[in-house]
Amino acid sequence: MSKIFGIVNITTDSFSDGGLYLDTDKAIEHALHLVEDGADVIDLGAASSNPDTTEVGVVEEIKRLKPVIKALKEKGISISVDTFKPEVQSFCIEQKVDFINDIQGFPYPEIYSGLAKSDCKLVLMHSVQRIGAATKVETNPEEVFTSMMEFFKERIAALVEAGVKRERIILDPGMGFFLGSNPETSILVLKRFPEIQEAFNLQVMIAVSRKSFLGKITGTDVKSRLAPTLAAEMYAYKKGADYLRTHDVKSLSDALKISKALG
């Protein structure tokens, strides 16, 4: 069964829940609720990546993360940190988090030595932007898929050459604005992600929760995307996704239980 990453955004401006969990105690409380709801891993993000985001500095990002990581580690909870800054990734290595989730796919070689010496798994995400937050750009679905496969090939090779054990790498094809503003690109990648698993023989994470392409197809705003999110997540589960990253852990966990019971 797919493992669930429960999202906790310790931010002011994340696209779906910015500001709700900026307070440390609220972030910890929410994380504990997500674990009760069925999350296998808590994915902490302290700097938003939405197209209209305001940049958060390294010091502030670490300040937001540190007490939450400490509290969750004390309870033995598996932790992922969603960050693309090498300095924050170094902090995460020191804190011995279980996963580092990089929306830019680890583009900075200066962090590779530290990554190689660590034990955490690395979520290597693809985006058409390569560097920076998601942007609203038009994309061609087939061209994006071809480019994505080449990107994964090159980045996996670079990490392995630097000493990162290949089996520690998890691939995330990106969704929503990370694939551009054309919803058909996300649909095509969602349909074809098993090709990524087959080509690289690595685990894949799918993160469709509340993403823009779902809203474009259904006409729903961010807070009304539970049904389309769950439909896409269950599709990914049936197609063999190893990890599902979601805001709505309880709904996904319950749906997975029913699907398993039905066989």
Curated annotation (Swiss-Prot):
For whether the record's keyword set contains Repeat, the answer is: no
Record carries keyword GTP-binding: no
Write out the entry's keywords from A to Z: Antibiotic resistance, Folate biosynthesis, Magnesium, Metal-binding, Plasmid, Transferase
Provide the residue positions that the database annotates as binding 4-aminobenzoate. 49, 177, 212
**Which cofactor is recorded for it?**
Mg(2+)
Annotated residues that bind 6-hydroxymethyl-7,8-dihydropterin are located at 101, 172, 211
* Signal peptide bounds: none
Which segments constitute the Pterin-binding domain? 2-257
Report the EC code(s) recorded for this entry.
2.5.1.15
Altering residue 179 to K: what's the impact? Answer: Fully complements folP deletion mutation in E.coli strain BW25113. Does not adversely impact growth or enzyme expression levels
Which reaction is the catalytic activity of this chain?
A: (7,8-dihydropterin-6-yl)methyl diphosphate + 4-aminobenzoate = 7,8-dihydropteroate + diphosphate
Query: Can you tell me which residues bind (7,8-dihydropterin-6-yl)methyl diphosphate?
Result: 82, 101, 172, 211, 245-247
The entry marks the following residues as binding Mg(2+), namely 9
On the tree of life, the source organism's domain of life is Bacteria
Annotated pathway: Cofactor biosynthesis; tetrahydrofolate biosynthesis; 7,8-dihydrofolate from 2-amino-4-hydroxy-6-hydroxymethyl-7,8-dihydropteridine diphosphate and 4-aminobenzoate: step 1/2
Q: Which family does it belong to?
A: Belongs to the DHPS family.
Instruction: Look up the further comments and give them.
Output: The sul3 gene is located on various large self-transmissible resistance plasmids and on transposons.
What is the role of the protein in this entry?
A: Catalyzes the condensation of para-aminobenzoate (pABA) with 6-hydroxymethyl-7,8-dihydropterin diphosphate (DHPt-PP) to form 7,8-dihydropteroate (H2Pte), the immediate precursor of folate derivatives. Confers resistance to sulfonamide antibiotics, including sulfamethoxazole (SMX), sulfadiazine and sulfisoxazole.
Mind telling me what this protein is named? Answer: Dihydropteroate synthase type-3
Give the organism, scientific name. Escherichia coli
